[in-house]
Amino acid sequence: MTNVYFLDIFMFVYVLQFLFYFKESMLGVLVNKFLGLLVVVFSYTDSLPLSSVISVFTFLVLLTCCFGGYFMYSFCPCGMIEFTFVYAMVAWLSTLLTFITSEKFSIYISKAGDSFLKTFSMLLVELVSEVSRPLALTVRLTVNVLVGHVISMMLYQLLELYLGIFYVWIVVLAIVMECFVFFIQSYIFSRLIYLYLNE
């Protein structure tokens, strides 16, 4: 079984060309369809054309971190508050800097016809609202991923207790539930970044 024959290599290369090498390869078509679906899900707008790209990139990075951490180390890095806080700060700063460079920022700070006291108090309220966003993103992502992990593991332990360890589909069900939590939380986080960009 350790012998490698020419026909084996030929068949391997023959299959690989359909996956990678042609202009319309199977893998390329699959990736293009998936990315097109993500752009549709994140509802591309003409006012901020890069907002959907940033959201899709955020979604894919978080999904990669979740799956990579879970399948390599059996713990998702999005469940660690340090990782999510740093990622939320970077994402929030990118949205804040995009917002500051737009023309809406001066209208956002002071509206015409308002008194000084009202403008000052509204500025403080808006400032607190802006500064609390990375903390809200951090807590939302961390807690939801941890709660999803705990609930899926509790269900797994409960099913294993009553049905025994002989059912392989219980382990598969627990992994599928974890993956579902990763998809949902990555989507919610990137969707919030998209909404912050479109304000």
Curated annotation (Swiss-Prot):
GO terms for molecular function: proton-transporting ATP synthase activity, rotational mechanism. Pfam families: ATP-synt_A. InterPro entries: ATP_synth_F0_asu, ATP_synth_F0_asu_AS, ATP_synth_F0_asu_bact/mt, F0_ATP_A_sf. Mitochondrial membrane ATP synthase (F(1)F(0) ATP synthase or Complex V) produces ATP from ADP in the presence of a proton gradient across the membrane which is generated by electron transport complexes of the respiratory chain. F-type ATPases consist of two structural domains, F(1) - containing the extramembraneous catalytic core and F(0) - containing the membrane proton channel, linked together by a central stalk and a peripheral stalk. During catalysis, ATP synthesis in the catalytic domain of F(1) is coupled via a rotary mechanism of the central stalk subunits to proton translocation. F-type ATPases have 2 components, CF(1) - the catalytic core - and CF(0) - the membrane proton channel. CF(1) has five subunits: alpha(3), beta(3), gamma(1), delta(1), epsilon(1). CF(0) has three main subunits: a, b and c. This is ATP synthase subunit a. It is a multi-pass membrane protein. It is found in: Mitochondrion inner membrane. The keyword Methyltransferase does not apply. It comes from the Eukaryota. Belongs to the ATPase A chain family. The chain crosses the membrane at residues 2-22, 25-45, 53-73, 80-100, 143-163, 164-184. The gene is ATP6. Keywords: ATP synthesis, CF(0), Hydrogen ion transport, Ion transport, Membrane, Mitochondrion, Mitochondrion inner membrane, Transmembrane, Transmembrane helix, Transport. One of its GO terms (cellular component) is mitochondrial inner membrane.
